[in-house]
A protein has these predicted regions:
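Bacterial N-terminal signal peptides
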Residues: 14-26
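Exposed acidic/Ser/Thr-rich ligand/metal-binding surfaces
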Residues: 33, 43-44, 52, 58-67, ...
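C-terminal "exit" segments of structured domains
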Residues: 213-271
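Short, ordered, surface-exposed loop/turn motifs in non-cytosolic proteins
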Residues: 241-263, 326-346, 402-419
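Short, solvent-exposed S/T- and G/P-enriched segments that are highly enriched in secreted/extracellular
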Residues: 261-279, 342-357, 382, 416-433, ...
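Structured interaction patches on ligand/partner-binding surfaces of diverse proteins
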Residues: 269-271, 291-316, 371-393, 447-475
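Short Pro-Gly-centered beta-turn/loop motif in secreted/extracellular proteins
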Residues: 269-287, 291-295, 353-365, 369-372, ...
Length: 475
């Protein structure tokens, strides 16, 4: 599992090996289920075993095939007594010789059942390693091996010493089946393999390099321990000083292989300020999205299987209050504002005036959708409220009714002008328009005028709460 220095891990409980202390079956589903199922959840482990011809190569004095069968048999024995656990065995490359180049040589040899270690061991004694390496075909066939059970945890463990030999893409197949929720992120054990061998299998799932027999035994134990051990996560949301005071924010655990959200939990702290403990399936890898505004996303959160993980994030928040002016009725009606992190193009949130919104502490640009638009730079501070308002508008009343083309410009202090508004193109000039206080210019030509020189220019001033009437061409 990936570990990072940004997080704190406390209350750690050891998992041990698969053959060691009793492990609890994880009670959280592969789907985004926050409530426990009514009946105990079943975990199904499908062993996908490579029986290609290369498995007969020697490995520390004995064929890889014999080592793999022996280790797999011992593991099945060690798991035989676990409740709510079913095992299955699919093999590939064992029905046809390598010379046949058969790319559909895979079969479910032992279907899922509880306490079926003897069946698995008996079947292993009858199989022969001799054929091709159709990993992709075997993966896709495994989709039909798992019973239709939406509440179960489906786990696939691939044991192989070779790469795909059938011009297919096992990585794409694995991703596709994970997205379809056939199984969780697979475990892949490369036996007797060189280091670069694993680089081509890492995309399948969690890869382990068992270059030695001793390592193979350890890896097998570790994989099963991860599968069966209970894992919990508590998330502390702190202020700028590291105090865990933030809460009531949705936490989304996103499967970073499939991109699908697996869990949504609205953060909770008890009366003592402690974050509650969440049951999270450690067989997935996650990005955590803390749905503050704007959201905080941490890629590859380091959740360790069989541990009581505590993750800590700084998410100091303050409140933005969009305060409307004291003018009733407001000629604008409902005014909206667009809030962006200072200097950022993306919108953090759009809100109507009269509302309050929690924001991460920091500087923001608030664009007020008045006419003309206003931009305010504000600083949101931890635990404080900052207000943004705008001057009460006045109203422009163009009294002349002429068809034509016109625009309104704001007059700036440096005597430049900034476009604000276009009158209806070719339509009537008569209108009532709420505007911000300030100096403006109206430029208009009638539709029937025979030249640009017949343009009328009128300067006017808008005052809060007042109506300014403007006539065109002296009318």
């Amino acid at each position: 599992m990936v570990l990072g220095g940004l997080f704190s891990f406390v209350r750690k409980a050891g998992t041990g090996g698969a053959l060691g202390l009793g492990l609890l079956l994880l009670g959280s589903g592969a789907r985004a289920q926050n409530a426990p199922p009514e009946k105990p959840q079943v975990t199904r482990i499908l062993f996908l075993l490579d029986a290609s011809g290369s498995m007969m190569a020697p490995w520390e004095g004995q064929p890889r095939w014999e080592v793999a069968k022996r280790m797999l048999g011992k593991m099945a024995d060690s798991l035989n007594a676990y409740p709510n656990l079913e095992l299955g065995l699919r093999v590939y490359g064992h029905q046809f010789p390598n010379s046949a180049k058969n790319c559909e040589d895979s079969r479910l040899e032992v279907p899922f059942a509880p306490r079926n270690a003897q069946a698995i061991k008996a079947k292993l004694t009858t199989l022969k390693a001799q054929g091709n390496t159709p990993i992709t075909y075997a993966l896709r066939q495994s989709a039909g091996d798992f019973p239709a059970d939406k509440t179960a945890r489906n786990v696939l463990l691939l044991i192989t010493d070779g790469l795909e030999s059938c011009n297919a893409d096992p990585c794409a197949a694995s991703l596709d089946l994970q997205r379809k929720r056939v199984f969780l992120k697979p475990f892949v054990i490369g036996i007797g393999a060189q280091q670069d061998f694993g680089k081509q299998l890492e995309c399948l799932g969690q890869y382990y390099n068992a270059a030695e027999v001793k390592t193979f035994r350890t890896v097998m134990n570790d994989v099963v321990a991860q599968t069966l051990a209970k894992t919990t996560v508590a998330v502390n949301l702190t202020d700028a000083d590291g105090r865990p005071v933030e809460s009531n924010v949705n936490l989304t655990f996103v499967n970073n292989v499939t991109g699908q959200p697996e869990y949504n939990y609205v953060h909770y702290r008890d009366a003592q300020g402690r974050a509650d403990v969440l049951a999270i399936d450690a067989l997935q890898s996650y990005d955590l999205v803390i749905n503050t505004v704007p959201a905080v996303r941490q890629a590859n959160v380091p959740i360790r299987a069989g541990k009581a993980n505590v993750l800590t994030f700084k998410t100091p928040q303050g409140t933005l209050f969009l305060q409307p002016p004291a003018l009733t009725p407001n000629p604008y009606g409902a005014v909206q504002a667009v809030v962006r992190a200072a200097g950022a193009p993306a919108t953090a949130v759009a809100l109507p005036f009269g509302t309050r919104q929690k924001l991460l502490a920091g500087p923001y640009d608030v664009e007020v959708l008045t006419l003309p638009r206003l931009t305010r730079r504000v600083s949101v501070r931890q635990g404080q409220e900052v207000a943004v308002t705008y001057p009460a508008p006045g109203t422009l009343n163009i009294t002349t009714d002429l068809k034509g083309y016109g625009s309104i410009y704001q007059l700036n202090n440096d005597e430049s002008q900034t476009w604000v508004y276009n009158l209806p193109d070719g339509g009537s000039s008569k209108l009532n328009l709420p505007m911000q206080p300030g100096a403006y210019r109206l430029v208009f030509r009638t539709k029937t005028a025979l030249g640009s020189k017949f343009t009328d220019v009128r300067n006017f001033t808008i005052r809060s709460g007042q109506t300014t009437s403007v006539g065109i061409f002296g009318r």
